[in-house]
Regions:
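Bacterial N-terminal signal peptides that target proteins for export
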Residues: 1-9
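Structured catalytic-domain cores with a bias toward divalent-metal coordination
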Residues: 103, 179-604
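Hydrophobic h-region of N-terminal signal peptides that target proteins for export
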Residues: 11-19
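Extracellular and organelle-lumenal recognition/adhesion modules and their flexible linkers in secreted
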Residues: 18-193
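Short, surface-exposed beta-edge/turn micro-motifs
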Residues: 10, 60-61, 228, 579
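Short alpha-helical segments used as structural interaction elements across diverse proteins
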Residues: 2-3, 110, 244, 418
Length: 604
């Protein structure tokens, strides 16, 4: 997906001169049948023709887009680049009728992107999680966002594979204003005692500035966390700048004053272990981090202090080591995994197994959303398993036994990744692949704690959705989403480590969240009876409540509305899902420049 996003950005920039004042010829009525459709752009390796037969409706026109020859780019783009016009500050439903030819590997995806001033990225979505593969005409749609500051809207169709795609009746339909004034919910009279309890019992956090090392305000955490050897730090979404800052400061405190020496990321094990070498170099810290940690974090400037801090510890008696527990490739050094194959001796891997793995890695890199066939899955998994087993057997006599064990685990994860790529989406509930990925991440984290970093205390950086436990008990308050069959990483870890793992979730009252590649509207006001409204009424900019220490029957041990999971207002006895919550009154985004609001930085 990162490759497609980057390429679409470059495509849009290259086509800036072609930008129109508004969407044009969405129903293909302009121009003659059999000709190129007016107003649309595509690469020279593709041919587009207007049709009036075989379309989605008897009286409609449509377009065929077809690859020419075999020398094709990673994907084709049939698109328009327009001024926002009346779409500005609107939620916009983007839809089209699409079908693809029945050719192996043939896929299509609707895509929509907004560009902001100074070449900043706005909203982006490309159906990478649900590509179009049906030969039947079907209507596809999603709701996009055009920010008030947007300078350009880019939209169209992506083609994957050497095939022919048909499309018709593209539509851009405003669904309502994107940004509305924030109106504080009115505190209910019956909730006043709860606010008073928070004022007296919540732990005030003086600052979230990661550069501020006066940790007097964090001292209560020593008693709360106690002997836990794993502390999991969640986040509501992957664009929560204030949460990131708070986590970075917590990491410094846990490392310097509580003996936590490992930082484990929701990123690839192979990538993050290799990243350690880059951190220990002259490369800029954030650039080095991008070799291992997903770009949703490392493309933002707010993360720089953390990686510079990690670098500063490497020559000390207690360096902060970094690792990952995800089975996915996450960094910019995927070619390094291919080089590992070249370096494996004949006694470890046959040429056939090397080639099978090599072909699969390249297919994943070349085709976003690549889904192996059953035969490809079985072949790649078998090859990865044989290589992993051979590496483990040879570890005892290897020149570098730990390196051999590291590579064995990496190939084991690769086999799991191949299976993950075969997963599909249900019509309702949680994504079917989430439990598989979460279970593997949980098993990996337990392995890190009990084996790879045995005797070390570990800090976990991940989404709150992954570190939660007892997810089935969460009332999403949505008909189309439930967690009843969702086995999370946090559940796996909790069942193995129990109270040796302490989990902190985060939430916010107001503000804005966005990662470096997307822009989101400001947060909507929380419910009047929500935990966030109670915290806000208590008047603390930052505060933490320890759920573990609450007595039975406490009001926080009852179902409450809170939004730690993607800012959706869900209901649960959150004390059964997390061990603590850290509240931020005002959220701010993780921008490429790493800007923060006035007053956040307290270190002089």
């Amino acid at each position: 997906m990162k490759i497609v996003r980057r390429a679409l950005l470059m495509s849009a920039m290259a086509a800036a001169a072609l930008a129109q004042t508004g969407p044009r010829n969405l129903d293909f009525r302009e121009g003659a049948v059999g000709e190129e459709p007016a107003g649309w752009n595509h690469q020279p390796q593709y041919e587009a023709r207007v049709l009036d037969t075989g379309c989605h409706k008897p009286d409609a026109r449509c377009v065929s887009i077809e690859a020419k020859g075999n020398d094709l780019p990673p994907f084709g783009s049939f698109s328009q680049f327009v001024a926002p016009g009346d779409l500005r500050n609107q939620r916009v439903k983007f839809s089209a009728w699409v079908r693809v030819t029945e050719v192996p590997g043939c896929k299509a995806q609707l895509w929509f992107r907004t560009d902001l001033p100074d070449n900043a990225a706005g909203f982006f979505y490309n159906m990478n999680d649900r590509p179009i593969t049906s030969p039947e005409w079907k209507l596809y749609e999603f709701v996009a966002q055009v920010q008030p500051e947007a300078v350009k809207v880019n939209f169209g169709l992506i083609l994957l594979g050497a095939c022919k795609v048909y499309a018709g009746d593209f539509k851009l339909e405003p669904q309502g204003i994107l940004e509305t004034p924030f109106v504080d919910p009115k505190l209910r009279t019956e909730d006043a005692p709860k606010v008073e309890w928070l004022k007296k019992n919540a732990i005030p956090i003086r600052t979230i500035d990661p550069a501020d090392d006066d940790f007097a305000d964090l001292q209560p955490l020593k008693k709360i966390i106690g002997d836990a050897r794993v502390v999991q730090l969640g986040e509501q979404s992957h664009g929560d700048g204030a949460t990131f800052y708070a986590k970075e400061r917590l990491i410094r405190f846990l490392h310097e004053q509580m003996g936590f020496d490992v930082l484990a990321w929701e990123s690839g094990f192979y990538d993050c272990e290799e990243m350690n070498q880059a951190i220990d170099s002259d490369m800029p810290a954030l650039e080095a981090a991008q070799k291992g940690v997903f770009g949703i974090w490392t493309r933002g400037g707010l993360m720089t202090p953390l990686f510079e801090y990690a670098r500063s510890t490497l020559k000390t008696a207690r360096p902060l080591r970094q690792t990952g527990f995800d089975i996915q490739f996450s960094g910019s050094n995927q070619q390094g995994f291919l080089k590992v194959l070249d370096d494996l001796g004949d006694g470890i891997a046959s040429d056939a197994d090397k080639q099978t793995v090599r072909d699969t890695v390249r297919a994943m890199a070349r085709t976003p959303g690549y889904k192996p066939s059953k035969e490809e899955e079985m072949a790649a998994q078998a090859a990865a398993t044989r290589i992993a087993e051979a590496l483990r057997k040879s570890a005892g006599s290897a020149r570098d036994p730990r390196r051999a064990q590291f590579l064995a685990k990496s190939f084991e994860d690769f086999g799991a990744l191949v299976h993950l790529r075969t997963q599909t989406l249900p019509s309702q509930g949680i994504r079917a692949d989430f439990s598989f990925r979460d279970i593997k991440m949980g098993e990996n984290l337990i392995w890190l704690a009990n084996d790879w970093y045995k005797g070390k205390k570990i800090i976990v950086w991940a989404a709150s959705m992954h570190v939660t436990r007892n997810a089935a008990a969460i009332d999403t308050r949505m008909d189309t989403l439930n967690y009843k069959d969702y086995r999370t990483m946090g559940q796996v870890v909790h069942e193995s480590l129990g109270k040796a793992a302490y989990t902190i979730t985060f939430t916010a009252y107001r503000g804005k969240s966005a990662n470096p590649s997307t822009s989101q509207p400001p947060l909507m006001p929380p419910a009047a009876e929500s935990v966030e409204t109670l915290f806000h009424a208590a008047g603390m900019p930052y505060a933490l409540v320890d759920f573990r220490g609450l007595p039975e029957g406490h009001w926080l041990r009852t179902p409450m509305i809170m939004r730690p999971l993607g800012y959706a207002q869900m209901k649960s006895d959150w004390t059964t899902n997390f061990d603590a919550v850290l509240f931020t009154d005002v959220m701010f985004p993780n921008t490429p420049a790493g800007t923060v609001p006035a007053g956040v930085k307290t270190k002089k």
